[in-house]
Amino acid sequence: MTKTDIATRVHNHTWKLDPIVRSLIDTDFYKLLMLQMIWKLYPEVDATFSLINRTKTVRLAEEIDEMELREQLDHARTLRLSKKENIWLAGNTFYGRSQIFEPEFLSWLSSYQLPEYELFKRDGQYELNFHGRWMDTTLWEIPALSIINELRSRSAMRSLGYFTLDVLYARAKAKMWEKVERLRELPGLRISDFGTRRRHSFLWQRWCVEALKEGIGPAFTGTSNVLLAMDSDLEAVGTNAHELPMVVAALAQTNEELAAAPYQVLKDWNRLYGGNLLIVLPDAFGTAAFLRNAPEWVADWTGFRPDSAPPIEGGEKIIEWWRKMGRDPRTKMLIFSDGLDVDAIVDTYRHFEGRVRMSFGWGTNLTNDFAGCAPKTIASLKPISIVCKVSDANGRPAVKLSDNPQKATGDPAEVERYLKFFGEEDHKEQKVLV
């Protein structure tokens, strides 16, 4: 892969448009896995995705130029799956399985175009929504977030001279390499890049991925970014996300269907995928509620991804549940991925070492950690907590509760209804930084 002098590239902005999203597969692998399931099982369902800035003190509409945002969103809509990308998706082996994507699905994807968007300003923030069929709107999530984040980074650095930029990136590289050296101390570590959605930039994410590939070798198990996986000859990693139970729950007509929604999603997933892709994401409506009502067969799945509880606390609860179900945790997998940095990775690894199989998904603090790197303080280089979530399905409001009430999304009245239905056991307020 060609190496890029990032500081020079950032400084020399003389072209009309420097695309942030370069490919339809500049996205997370699990978006394609979920898309195939949606395309196959839920083709007539409508779903709206909406941008949510949880860092309210940052007024995005005052930091990002609307015309630049529209240009980047419009460019993303011109992208199509290339012949090379189609061949790679069709012929590559993912999670030990060949032809994981059906030919009919790839044929449909080859003519896919991101649908139109709705954008306006309100109280210093951008309101950005994507309306349409679920299988059309779902792929907007990752490019929308990466566009917002990189435009914010570009705005922060626009006034910086070449040498200031050179120092900024030199310090960021040194900071990143210090993390690599700490990770080398963990024997048997398995860690992958989950940093696409809130990355500083595409070029910086690519540098971080290449640094991990060289720096920790086999301990680096891949990247969630499909384009980088293809270009860097890495494993594409990822399983499923909250949007699946959120939509299925929103479609529920009865309390029985609402209660069954998280498990219906797993049944659907199991129809298409198996093995190491059988990873449970339990916290959409609270992990305690999920475990309390989970059928016996859920314990036979490969593992869990505890996403919003503190990692050690969340992992212990799942291990306790496995034991209660008569399963040996040492044969199971825990994937930790919520707001991790090196300290949390090291602490969690050492806590669970020898008790359970582990893997780590390293996101924002891998691909967007520039704290203390600029010669002067630049607040806009600090990452924010921004998401793009399903807001409704077939006109019905969609809700995510999470184990952390700070991460709850949805219409307040519906959030309250879900809390009464699923309960608030083990919900714990934690400050959301990324």
Curated annotation (Swiss-Prot):
One of its GO terms (biological process) is NAD biosynthetic process via the salvage pathway. GO terms for molecular function: nicotinate phosphoribosyltransferase activity. Transiently phosphorylated on a His residue during the reaction cycle. Phosphorylation strongly increases the affinity for substrates and increases the rate of nicotinate D-ribonucleotide production. Dephosphorylation regenerates the low-affinity form of the enzyme, leading to product release. GO terms for cellular component: cytosol. Pathway: Cofactor biosynthesis; NAD(+) biosynthesis; nicotinate D-ribonucleotide from nicotinate: step 1/1. The modification Phosphohistidine is found at residue 242. It is an enzyme of class 6 (ligase). This is Nicotinate phosphoribosyltransferase. It comes from Agrobacterium fabrum (strain C58 / ATCC 33970) (Agrobacterium tumefaciens (strain C58)). The lineage of its organism: Bacteria, Pseudomonadati, Pseudomonadota, Alphaproteobacteria, Hyphomicrobiales.
